């Protein structure tokens, strides 16, 4: 891999230098890179950045009775994003608007990735959520989740991620990766059963953050 250090926004705090690190893959696969904490970003070409990535370790998941009861009320299907873009995009755009999230530009940029699949979640035949993800060889990489805000008791954000993690397990794959996990931006990820974080050298349990 070709490593790039971006000093354009770099700075020094207490005599420590902070800058961004990126890589352009050479012979590495997607799985190789995400297993080492790198995350893809669409650029010409695709470059990968280092962040506090997180993943769901299925062997460490322990679901509460409440969560199991919620999951029992839901069904999901795995579909190709290509061909249902209009339906999925409309659901996501409405979700962004209702949550007042300025994410449409990033969502559209991510739509340029190849091999995007969609998990469609339903309750009593009504669509209550979508999650887009990339189906890799050894793992899956979750991208974005949107859900119906009229079902707060279902905790559909976390529940959708757990459903996708279970689908990953049923595929006999290793883990579901779900991008960054910084607590000031993604506090809900700290609550996901089985969550692990990339600390720069190895994967660690969320217990060290409690």
Predicted regions and their residues:
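A conserved beta-strand-loop-helix scaffold within acyl/acetyltransferase catalytic domains
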Residues: 44-46, 66-153, 183
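Short Asp/Glu-rich motifs
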Residues: 52, 187-188, 208
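Acyl-donor-binding surface of acyltransferase catalytic domains
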Residues: 1-75, 79
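Acyl-donor binding region in acyl/amide transferases
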Residues: 16-30, 115-116, 127-197, 203
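Long, intrinsically disordered, low-complexity Ser/Thr/Pro-rich regulatory/activation regions
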Residues: 201, 206-209
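Short coil/loop linkers at secondary-structure junctions
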Residues: 39-40, 102, 174, 195
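Alpha-helix boundary/capping residues
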Residues: 36-37, 95, 99, 192-196
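Well-ordered beta-strand positions enriched in small/hydrophobic/aromatic, beta-favoring residues
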Residues: 52-54, 119, 176
């Amino acid at each position: 891999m070709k490593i790039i250090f971006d000093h354009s926004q770099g700075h020094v705090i207490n005599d420590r230098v902070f800058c961004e690190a990126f890589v352009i893959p050479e012979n590495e696969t997607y799985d190789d890179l995400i297993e080492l904490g790198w995350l893809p970003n669409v650029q010409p070409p695709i470059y990968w950045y280092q962040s506090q990535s997180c993943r769901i370790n299925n062997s460490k998941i322990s679901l509460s009775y409440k969560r199991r009861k919620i999951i029992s009320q839901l069904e999901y299907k795995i579909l190709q994003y290509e061909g249902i873009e209009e339906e999925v995009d409309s659901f996501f755009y409405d979700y962004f608007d209702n949550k007042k999230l300025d994410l449409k530009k990033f969502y559209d940029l991510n739509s340029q990735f190849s091999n995007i699949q969609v998990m469609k979640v339903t309750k009593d035949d009504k669509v209550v959520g979508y999650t887009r993800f990339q189906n890799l060889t050894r793992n899956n990489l979750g991208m974005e989740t949107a859900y119906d805000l009229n079902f707060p008791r279902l905790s559909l954000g976390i529940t959708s991620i757990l459903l996708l993690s279970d689908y990953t397990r049923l595929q006999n794959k290793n883990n579901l990766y779900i991008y960054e996990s910084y607590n000031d931006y993604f506090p809900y990820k700290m609550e996901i059963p089985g969550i692990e974080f990339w600390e720069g050298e190895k994967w660690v349990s969320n217990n060290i953050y409690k």
